[in-house]
Curated annotation (Swiss-Prot):
This is Vacuolar protein sorting-associated protein 29. It is a peripheral membrane protein. It is found in: Cytoplasm; Membrane; Endosome membrane; Early endosome. Keywords: Acetylation, Cytoplasm, Endosome, Membrane, Metal-binding, Protein transport, Transport, Zinc. One of its GO terms (cellular component) is late endosome.
Length: 186
């Protein structure tokens, strides 16, 4: 595993207001000591959730969601992992939510290879003009203003040299489904 960095990307937990906890099947997969970095798109919403993330990885980066109790989280953050500059934002600043042009503008402003945003509670990962965009969805499957039927999801990025292999974990019914997406830095 030399040269690999495992990055957990998740957000919109909304614990305890909309959900009690992460799905048990996700917790089983998230074992301490395997993950180097955590990038969280916010809306945890409490210190307990933060403390849980700290048990999984030493390096935890969080941006503030519109429901977070901790107002000290920054609005945005740029983190470098290996050869990749990664921008992190909650996503309520993106108007309309998840809008491609707005996301691309943020990507250029932050000057990043990968832009991670949340807020919509809907998983997405795609390449646009040689940059990579990820929305990890809601790790608990919390409802949002527009949608009550949300599939719980999180993302693991395996970063090695100039390649990121993104694994998306979705809890569909009782089964965890995994999808793999590869992005190479041009």
């Amino acid at each position: 595993m030399a040269g690999h960095r495992l990055v957990l990307v998740l957000g919109d937990l909304h614990i305890p207001h909309r959900c009690n906890s992460l799905p048990a099947k996700f917790k089983k997969l998230l074992v301490p000591g395997k993950i180097q970095h955590i990038l969280c798109t916010g809306n945890l919403c409490t210190k307990e959730s933060y403390d849980y993330l700290k048990t999984l990885a030493g390096d935890v980066h969080i941006v503030r969601g519109d429901f977070d109790e901790n107002l000290n989280y920054p609005e945005q953050k740029v983190v470098t992992v290996g050869q990749f500059k990664i921008g992190l934002i909650h996503g309520h600043q993106v108007i309309p939510w998840g809008d491609m042009a707005s996301l691309a503008l943020l990507q250029r402003q932050f000057d990043v290879d990968i832009l991670i945003s949340g807020h919509t509670h809907k998983f997405e990962a795609f390449e646009h003009e040689n940059k990579f965009y990820i929305n990890p969805g809601s790790a608990t499957g919390a409802y949002n203003a527009l949608e009550t039927n949300i599939i719980p999801s999180f993302v693991l990025m395996d970063i090695q040299a100039s390649t990121v292999v993104t694994y998306v974990y979705q809890l569909i019914g009782d089964d965890v489904k995994v999808e793999r997406i590869e992005y190479k830095k041009s």
